[in-house]
Structures are given as C-alpha cells and as structure tokens.
C-alpha cells in the first residue's frame, strides 16, 4: 500500500514501478487497481495508459475515495467497495474481460499514522479498525461481545500469536470490569493489556503487533475478501492478462501463492488417485496461469521506506 513515514512526508508506494511494469502489457486495455489507497499505483497506470485504456479502482476507505476524487481523468473510475465485489462492479459497467488486475494488500501508512482510525498500538485512539468507517462493527464492539474462545482463535489464526489464549483471557477479564471502568474501547489500553499478557518479547517487535493485525484482519474480513477477489480477478482476465498481487505478511502471501500455483500447476493439486494414475499428455489438466515470478523490494527501497521490508509481489499471466 501507499506508505508515509510521518505526517507531512510524501507518500511512498511500495514496488511502484515494478508493479506497473508487470501489470501493463498493452496500453489500450481495461485495468483494475483493487486497492486505490492514496493513488500511487493508479496515477502511474494512468500515466502509462494510452487514450483507449481504462482504469477502474476500488477501495473501502472513505478517505481513499475522497483522494480519488482529485484524479481528473476520463479514463478513470472509482468504486467505494471491496475488490471482492469486482464481478458486480464490472457487470454494472457492462465490462466482461480485463487486461490486468493489481491487488496491493494490507494497510497504508496514512491509516496507521492516524490514531483516530484505531489501527495503531503506538497512538491512542478509538478501538475502531474498520477500513470502511461507514459500515460494519468496530473492533471494540466485537471484543465486547465475542466469546473468549473466538477471541483466542482470531488472535491465534490471524495474528499467529502463541499467547492468544492468555490475551483472550485478559480481554474477557477486563470486560467484566466494564461497569466500573467503562468499556475497552481505546487502542492504548488494549496495547497495554496485551503487553501484560505476553510473557516474552520478540526483538524489534511490539508485543501488541500480532493482536492488532489479527483484529484488523477479522474486522475487515481481509482474508475472505482476498480469496474471493483472487477468484473473480482470474475469471475476468483475458488471455495474456496479468494478475499482480503485493502482500505484506505470510497469511496473505500463502493464500496468493497457493491460488496461483493451483492454476499454474493443476497436476500437483489434482486428487491423489489422479496423480497416481498413468495419464497421457492430453489427459493432464491444462495450466490456466503462467507464473511470471516473485519480486521483493530492493535494498534502496527498504532503506528509504522501512515499512516495505516485508512486501512480496507475485505475478501471473492467464494462459
């Protein structure tokens, strides 16, 4: 996503040129930017598109929609929605196939750096965490109602946090004190609560990192949206069309990798009995995607933008 080290510094789009180089294989196609953010990728796509090209961008964040309103280009359109609803949006516009889809996953620095959004454990703010602040329940609302086992499951599965059970117990214990202390609805209090529950520290990582990631993913249904969005993106790609996905943690990258490999190497994902049977060449499942590689940020980019360090970009082409 677009990153910004602190208020007032210019936005830095991760793998900006690499992503667009991989995505744009013809300049007159219809392209999708599934996560507009602050528009870093979209603006570069528009710079490189020919007069016959089109770009449709998606974002759930109202702030991103406001930013998209500053793009004055007849070839551009923005959808205030998740890229998971790609099919419906394209159908409404009478569009069948597209030349490429870019998904830049995760959270942007402007979202993290604004305490009022509730994503940051370093700044106090309401425990919100919604990408789309116009709908859905907040992290505070979910924590106030969820079963202790569900809280532990979310923190374990989406945060890969080994102290998930202890953190869930601490949250539920604090919830019992709501009558005298008020609800658990501030990021600073949750961060302090997690720090007390986590028994060991990882070097260079705040103890609340994994819990905040897990709650954000759950509140926004990020992994479910990713799985749905990948399927829709593939189905909409024309022959030769490109799918470019930038992920920032192992849960996202694992989903992307498995999805692409299943379509590029269908014989490996076939049923065990089919893999064991001797098949003629024409009986083998045909690949539907061609893997074009994996890219990491350069040392120079990581030095200039440390938050890009974990980024992995995977590229595939429809056969």
From Swiss-Prot:
Superkingdom field? Bacteria
Reported function? Specifically methylates the N4 position of cytidine in position 1402 (C1402) of 16S rRNA.
UniProt main location, coarse: cytoplasm
Q: Which GO terms describe its biological process?
A: rRNA base methylation
Catalysed reaction equations from the record: cytidine(1402) in 16S rRNA + S-adenosyl-L-methionine = N(4)-methylcytidine(1402) in 16S rRNA + S-adenosyl-L-homocysteine + H(+)
Q: What is this protein called?
A: Ribosomal RNA small subunit methyltransferase H
Q: Which InterPro entries match?
A: RsmH, SAM-dep_MeTrfase_MraW_recog, SAM-dependent_MTases_sf
EC number(s) per entry: 2.1.1.199
* Family to which this protein belongs: Belongs to the methyltransferase superfamily. RsmH family.
Q: Name one Pfam family in it.
A: Methyltransf_5
What subcellular compartments does it reside in? Cytoplasm
GO MF annotation list: rRNA (cytosine-N4-)-methyltransferase activity
Q: What gene is this protein a product of?
A: rsmH
Q: Which UniProt keywords apply?
A: Cytoplasm, Methyltransferase, rRNA processing, S-adenosyl-L-methionine, Transferase
Example GO CC term: the record gives:
cytoplasm
Q: Which residues bind S-adenosyl-L-methionine?
A: 39-41, 59, 83, 104, 111
């Amino acid at each position: 996503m677009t990153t910004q080290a602190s208020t007032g510094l210019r936005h830095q789009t991760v793998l900006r040129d690499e992503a667009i180089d991989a995505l744009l294989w013809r300049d007159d196609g219809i392209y999708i930017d599934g996560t507009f953010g602050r528009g870093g990728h979209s603006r570069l796509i528009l710079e490189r598109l020919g007069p016959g090209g089109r770009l449709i961008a998606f974002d759930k964040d109202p702030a991103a929609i406001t930013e998209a309103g500053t793009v004055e280009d007849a070839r551009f359109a923005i959808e205030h929605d998740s890229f998971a609803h790609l099919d419906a949006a394209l159908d409404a516009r009478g569009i069948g196939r597209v030349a490429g889809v870019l998904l830049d996953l995760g959270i942007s620095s402007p979202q993290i750096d604004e305490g009022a959004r509730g994503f940051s454990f370093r700044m106090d703010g309401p425990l919100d965490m919604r990408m789309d602040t116009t709908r859905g329940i907040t992290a505070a609302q979910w924590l106030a109602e969820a079963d202790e086992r569900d809280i532990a499951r979310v923190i374990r599965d989406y945060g890969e946090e080994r102290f998930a059970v202890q953190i869930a117990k601490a949250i539920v214990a604090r919830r019992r004190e709501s009558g005298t202390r008020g609800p658990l609805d501030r990021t600073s209090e949750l961060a302090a609560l997690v720090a007390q529950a986590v028994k060991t520290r990882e070097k260079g990582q705040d103890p609340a990192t994994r819990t905040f990631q897990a709650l954000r993913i759950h509140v926004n249904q990020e992994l479910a949206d990713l799985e749905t969005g990948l399927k829709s993106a593939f189905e909409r790609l024309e022959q030769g069309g490109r799918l470019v996905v930038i992920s920032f943690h192992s849960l996202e990258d694992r989903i992307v990798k498995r999805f692409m490999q299943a379509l590029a190497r269908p014989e490996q994902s076939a049923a065990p009995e089919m893999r064991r049977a001797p098949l003629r060449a024409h009986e083998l499942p045909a690949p539907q995607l061609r893997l074009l590689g994996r890219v990491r940020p350069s040392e120079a980019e990581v030095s200039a933008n440390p938050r890009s360090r974990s980024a992995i970009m995977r590229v595939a082409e429809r056969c």
